[in-house]
Amino acid sequence: MISAQNLVYSLQGRRLTDNVSLTFPGGEIVAILGPNGAGKSTLLRQLTGYLQPDSGECRLFNKPLNEWSITELAKHRAVMRQNSHMAFPFSVQEVIQMGRHPHRTGNQDNETAQIMALCDCQALANRDYRQLSGGEQQRVQLARLLVQLWEPTPSPKWLFLDEPTSALDIHHQQHLFRLLRQLVHERQFNVCCILHDLNLAAHYADRVVLMQKGKVIANGKPQDVLTQQALTMLYGADITVLKDPANHSPLIVLDH
């Protein structure tokens, strides 16, 4: 379980997270939604130990994040940031194998090959990472995270993904979320992701968190949270929320 209690973080006099408390019990895909500047990425950085809050506390398995060593924390959670540029000419396979750094054993070629296949990266293996498209880089970064967390442990693993679909085509968006569901159900993975695509969140997330001006304003199942009234107030956009006939999840449509 990961928990956040009364997180406050300010920068240049502006509250980026304002008394945020959340619990992530595990076994689910959680989507964090909100307009630009709502505090989503700041919250994610605090939940993963990359940013210390001004006040409040984050815990992993009831142990404060600041009491975990970097190496041990990296065995339990992995993070995909919005930007993953590299200055040096690493091959795709080398980038993916960087996920082994927290572990004492060296590269596991069979494991790496399996994960590259899961993430549709086999054909990219020998290419210069810097020459890939944005979507290809996102697939490679996901593979690196899975290599980092693939080694079996008694406790669950956590994937934190900041806008993981921002550069993916529709096929790879679907592939990503089907894979995430498989990891949740079969390998004790838990997923927390920031999204801007409301319909992806409605279709695939087990739980949705809405943020506005550093505060959590809603937290629950997609059908309870993604209402027309809530989304219109949150985004200031003219939208209609319908019901998807295939699975009865919310279907968000922009009005003309």
From Swiss-Prot:
Leading EC class: translocase
Main subcellular localisation: membrane
Its job: Part of the ABC transporter complex HmuTUV involved in hemin import. Responsible for energy coupling to the transport system.
Record-listed E.C. numbers: 7.6.2.-
Signal peptide: none
GO MF, one example: ATP hydrolysis activity
A Pfam family this chain is assigned to: ABC_tran
Binding site for ATP: 34-41
Location of this chain's protein in the cell: Cell inner membrane
Keyword flag Disulfide bond: no
One cellular component (GO) term of this entry: plasma membrane
Membrane topology: Peripheral membrane protein
ABC transporter domain location: 2-238
Protein name from the UniProt record: Hemin import ATP-binding protein HmuV
Sequence similarity: Belongs to the ABC transporter superfamily. Heme (hemin) importer (TC 3.A.1.14.5) family.
Key word Coiled coil present: no
Keyword list, A-Z: ATP-binding, Cell inner membrane, Cell membrane, Membrane, Nucleotide-binding, Translocase, Transport
Designated gene of the protein: hmuV
Species the sequence originates in: Escherichia coli O157:H7
